[in-house]
UniProtKB/Swiss-Prot annotation:
Organism: Alkalilimnicola ehrlichii (strain ATCC BAA-1101 / DSM 17681 / MLHE-1)
Pfam families xrefs: Pantoate_transf
Physiological role: Catalyzes the reversible reaction in which hydroxymethyl group from 5,10-methylenetetrahydrofolate is transferred onto alpha-ketoisovalerate to form ketopantoate.
One of the protein's GO biological processes: pantothenate biosynthetic process
Annotated binding of 3-methyl-2-oxobutanoate, by residue: D54, S55, D93, K122
Full protein name: 3-methyl-2-oxobutanoate hydroxymethyltransferase
Cofactor: Mg(2+)
Assembly mode: Homodecamer; pentamer of dimers.
């Protein structure tokens, strides 16, 4: 099934197209992938954005956190995904400490694009990353900012917890999102925040906001591939869902996920968080 050249049946997804989808009220469907085979399958299912996430440290390498993942590993897995030549836009994570300085950030983002073939990079961090985002934007590198729960800070945060439940924290996150947009971010990933805050930030920005555990009112949704296929060891996060339940095949599960996000059926209240926001 996956030998030879993968079929090209869709127009390529671009940054401009994602922005038009937000303007038109069409939900953006994103999903992680770490290899050629699943990149082909996701593209055929209609996924708009494939994220080569540093989550590979946990779901591929079996580590406890994403912190040990290296730039070399990200380049390798990004290259595997882009070998599928998907119509979906391929976004790659900047791993922990790969953008500790502006020079590091520029160099490693360039590696992910030149060596890995990524079309966008994603980096965690609040308003303090605005200068790097601006530098990357001036260099012609599309950027997805990442706010809310930031897995690379798990040791500082003391675990994986919902962020932005207090009013002051929610206001600060909205201000950070606006600062990152003003600096030149093309996309925002918002993780593990109250649904009301997800709505506020999505409505407060012109760029698309992709949620993961951020409620149904974001401009799109993203989940981890292994979670939606029900193969993640242990419990999956509350905001995720096993789409293999009732599906006859992996491809059917991927299509069910795409349809659920596109229609707005996912996430529902059971897969969202309450709180002040």
């Amino acid at each position: 099934m996956y030998t030879g050249d993968p079929p090209q049946t869709r127009r390529p997804v671009t940054v401009g197209r994602l922005q038009r989808m937000k303007a038109d009220g069409q939900k953006v469907v994103a999903l992680t992938a770490y290899d050629y085979t699943f990149a082909v399958a996701e593209d055929q299912a209609g996924v708009d954005v494939i994220l080569v996430g540093d989550s590979l440290g946990m779901v591929v390498q079996g580590r406890d956190t994403t912190v040990p993942v290296t730039v070399e590993e990200m380049v390798y897995h990004t290259r595997c995904v882009t070998a599928a030549r998907p119509s979906a836009l391929v976004m790659a994570d900047m791993p922990f400490m790969s953008y500790a300085t502006l020079e590091d950030g520029l160099r490693n983002a360039a590696r992910l694009m030149q060596e890995g073939g990524a079309q966008m990079i994603k980096l965690e961090g609040a308003g303090e990353q605005a200068e790097l985002v601006a530098r990357l934007a001036r260099a012609g590198i599309p950027v997805c900012a990442h706010l809310g729960l930031q897995p690379q800070l798990v040791h500082k945060l003391g675990g994986y917890r919902v962020q932005g439940r207090e009013s002051a924290a929610a206001d600060a996150m909205l201000a950070d999102a606006q600062a990152l947009e003003a600096a030149g971010a093309d996309l925002l990933l918002l993780e593990c925040v109250p649904a009301e805050l997800g709505r506020r930030i999505s409505q407060g920005l012109e760029i698309p906001v992709i949620g993961i555990g951020a409620g149904p009112d974001c401009d799109g949704q993203i989940l981890v591939l292994q979670d939606i296929l029900g193969v993640t060891p242990g419990r999956i996060p509350r905001f995720s869902k096993n789409f293999m339940n009732g599906a006859g095949s992996i491809q059917c599960a991927l299509q069910a996920y795409v349809q659920a996000v596109r229609s707005g059926a996912f996430p529902d209240a059971a897969h969202s968080f309450g709180g002040q926001g």
